[in-house]
Amino acid sequence: MKWFGVLGLVTLSECLVTIPLVKIKSLRENLREKDMLKEYLEKYPFRLTHKLLHKHADSGVAFEPMRNYLDIAYMGIISVGTPPQEFQVIFDTGSADLWVPSIYCSSPACSNHNTFNPLRSSTFVASGQPIKLIYGTGKMSGFVGYDTIKISSLVDRNQAFGLSVEEPDKILELATFDGILGLSYPSLSVKGVTPVFDNLWNQGLLSQKLFAFYLSRKGKKGSVVMFGGVDPSYYTGELHWVPVSKPLYWQISMDSISINGKVIACDGGCQAIVDTGTSLLLGPQDAVLNIQEIIQARRSTSGEYFIDCDAVNTLPDILFTIDGIGYPVPANAYIQKDAALGICFSSFEGNEDISNNSEEWILGDVFLRLYFTVFDRENDRIGLATAV
């Protein structure tokens, strides 16, 4: 272990920079209220294999399934340029690039979001490099520029980012957020582009090469992402460290998923991505269908799995065992309620592309609201502790 072990994490917590995150209405909720969810789920099924196995086809193209952002619920504010222009972005550990809408974008998705005007920034430098992020539902295309990015008190100079010129995706039009700030490994970014976190570290702006998330369960406020240190007041007990199994995504090995001592999924071990850009618990279709049956969730005409809201008081915890440590997810976490419609639904979602022989999961915000999470790039590991 490097010099900044657990004690280092605590003693250097005063050096960290904390960015507030605000809980927002998810795209799923917006689609459900507009009676568009069924059509969307049928037309754009999520493909987890794309997220796990993608390799860049060329220097300017990256594949990111927009389905991943259907349930995103937290965003924070950054600014771009001099003087600063503000944007609401998703801090996403499941992708690596930063992009925001630009004034050159004429798509409907750009007309109702903040757009960056490079002509009003004295520090903007155009690169001429095209960029295309291909989603499960469409694409975001544009070009790469360089400018000053401000994240709370951090001033990230000469940062490469994407400026959208075309956003034909209907989901981006309905999104509350303006853009995405990726926090995954550089190997996932568009070739030649240094991600924000790496640029911050290279400029000596961080005391430790790590960041952490606390996602509050107490309403819209209280959630934070912190850079360069860890604030122990956000968790109880000790951090348990899990090695990253594949430094592309924040991917780890998981031992099993069980209820009352009986393994119900991930039997014999599997892989899991810890992903702040996903809200639900995603896994192989067969395994998830088995879990839906166990918790008595019923498939609706929209394709979602609904459940009796009173079941939250009777259903058991579901235990995710990671590196020998059990992380229980209680019913009040894996059952979510749409307050506007007064209905409850399962937080598990299946993916038809994955067979049980190559079982992979994504642990999204349902899991992360329960467990404070540290993403340690120096040691390629993830730290988990019970969130306060």
Curated annotation (Swiss-Prot):
Domain Peptidase A1: 74-385
Cross-referenced InterPro entries: Aspartic_peptidase_A1 (IPR001461), Aspartic_peptidase_AS (IPR001969), Aspartic_peptidase_N (IPR012848), PEPTIDASE_A1 (IPR033121), Peptidase_aspartic_dom_sf (IPR021109)
PROSITE patterns, per database record: ASP_PROTEASE, PEPTIDASE_A1
Active site: D92, D275
Tissue occurrence: Trophoblast and placental tissue.
Assigned EC number: 3.4.23.-
Alphabetized UniProt keyword annotations: Aspartyl protease, Disulfide bond, Glycoprotein, Hydrolase, Protease, Secreted, Signal, Zymogen
Disulfide bonds: C105-C110, C266-C270, C309-C344
Positions annotated with a glycan in the UniProt record: N356
GO molecular function annotations of the record: aspartic-type endopeptidase activity
Superkingdom to which the source organism belongs: Eukaryota
Family: Belongs to the peptidase A1 family.
Identification of the protein by name: Pregnancy-associated glycoprotein
Species per Swiss-Prot/TrEMBL record: Equus caballus
